[in-house]
Every structure is written in C-alpha cells, then in structure tokens.
C-alpha cells in the first residue's frame, strides 16, 4: 500500500526479482499506479510486457554468463562477446539503453590484471555498443555476499571506465553493496557520478528500506 503517488523528482525503477510473487502484468499495473517508470533486470522476452504498460526497462539483462563468470576471465571472452553481440542490437531495437554486465570473480588476479582482462574483453564490444547507442553497465557488488567478486569498489570500477574511455561503458552504482564495502557513499557519488549510468538504492544491513533502522537514512 502506498499513501500517495511518487512526486516525480526522481525517475524510479524497481527490480522485479524482489517481488517474485507478482505476475509481471499485475506488477507493471501497480508500478504505473504509484508513479514508478521502469521495471528492470528483465530478459528480452519480458521487455514488451513492460512497454505495453507505458513503462520502460531502465537496466536490461539477457546477455553474459552471470555474476561469477565475467570479463575478468579471458577464457570466457569469446563466449561473452558472442552473447553481447546478439543482445546489444535487441536492446537498441527495443528502444532501451542500459545493458548489465559483470566483472566475474577475481580468481586470484591483482587489480591491475583484472583491469587489463576486463578492458581487453569489453573493448571488443564498445564499437557495437557505440553504434547502437547502448551503454554496457558493470554492476558494483560487495564481495562479502558475492564471494570473490572483482568489481567491488567504486575506485576500481571508475578506473576501468577511464581505461575503456567510452561513454558507452559505465557503472551501476549500488548503495547497498558499496555501504558494505567502503561506506563514504555521498562523497563517492559526488566524485564518481560521471561514470554511473544507473543507481540502485537499498539499506544496509539486509537491503531493507532506507529508513531510520538503517546505517544510511535519507528522509
């Protein structure tokens, strides 16, 4: 239940996986009623369902090999590139912009080697992403819950963006994950926001509502 619709000061999107009991059609109707503009982290088969309700998909998925198997592993580059080459045009054809990607596990490599590995794989896709005006967006995740995840600090992700050097590669900044890893949320947003294409919010601990029970509270 929502007491009043959203004011529209922020363009709100929600991740469907957090609300698994709802059918997507029903969920979209609820979202539209309260002023949410997007339902995200959906595969291509679901995009038309969202769009028929006048909503969008702020962060698309459907390419890649999951969180643990990402661009840090050169042995996966050919498979990853083939997957993204298929989905990037689909994102553009649907009128969407952001497509999620992942670094994968660290697997014992240094930060430097991780940058080099990810840069090598992702740069194979940048010309296609630029052609279709799609932004490949790597999510910053905590490596406590996602064991050994490489892209787990804002400064690491920002340096990868700098190395790739294209507006078509950016970061998904997740307040919940980064509060666990590093805190300093407001300063990091101010400093690194040019590298963000999208932001996820969630309280810590427990990814709860951002209220007075959480480490961060935005009234």
Give the label of every model feature segment.
Residues 57-59, 138, 173:
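Hydrophobic residues in well-ordered beta-strands that form the structural core
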Residues 47-61, 118, 134:
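Short acidic, glycine/proline-enriched helix-loop-strand junctions
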Residues 4-6, 73-171, 180-182:
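Active-site acidic/histidine proton-transfer and metal-coordination neighborhood
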Residues 61-69, 203-204:
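Short, acidic/turn-prone active-site loops that include or flank metal/cofactor-
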Residues 1-35, 40, 45, 95-97, ...:
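Histidine-acidic metal/acid-base catalytic patches
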Residues 44-55, 109-110, 213-216:
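Active-site-adjacent beta->alpha loops and helix N-cap segments on the catalytic face
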Residues 41, 60, 101:
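Short beta-strand and adjacent tight-turn residues that come in two discontinuous sequence segments
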């Amino acid at each position: 239940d929502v007491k009043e619709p959203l004011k529209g000061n922020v363009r709100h999107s929600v991740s469907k996986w957090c609300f698994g009991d709802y059918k997507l059609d029903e969920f979209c109707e609820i979202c539209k009623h309260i002023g949410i503009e997007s339902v995200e982290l959906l595969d291509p088969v679901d995009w038309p369902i969202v769009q028929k309700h006048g909503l969008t998909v702020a962060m698309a998925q459907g390419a890649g090999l999951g969180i643990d198997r990402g661009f840090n592993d050169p042995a996966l580059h050919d498979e990853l590139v083939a997957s993204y080459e298929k989905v990037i045009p689909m994102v553009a054809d649907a009128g969407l912009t952001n497509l999620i990607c992942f670094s994968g596990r660290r697997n014992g490599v240094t930060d430097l080697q991780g940058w080099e590995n990810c840069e090598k794989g992702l740069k194979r896709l940048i010309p296609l992403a630029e052609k279709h005006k799609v932004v490949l967006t790597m999510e910053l995740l905590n490596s406590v819950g996602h064991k050994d995840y490489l892209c787990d600090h804002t400064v690491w992700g920002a340096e990868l963006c700098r190395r790739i050097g294209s507006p078509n590669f950016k970061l998904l900044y997740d307040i919940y994950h980064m509060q666990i890893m590093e805190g300093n949320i407001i300063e990091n947003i101010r400093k690194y926001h040019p590298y963000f294409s999208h932001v996820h919010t969630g309280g810590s601990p427990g990814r709860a509502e951002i209220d007075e029970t959480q480490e961060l509270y935005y009234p």
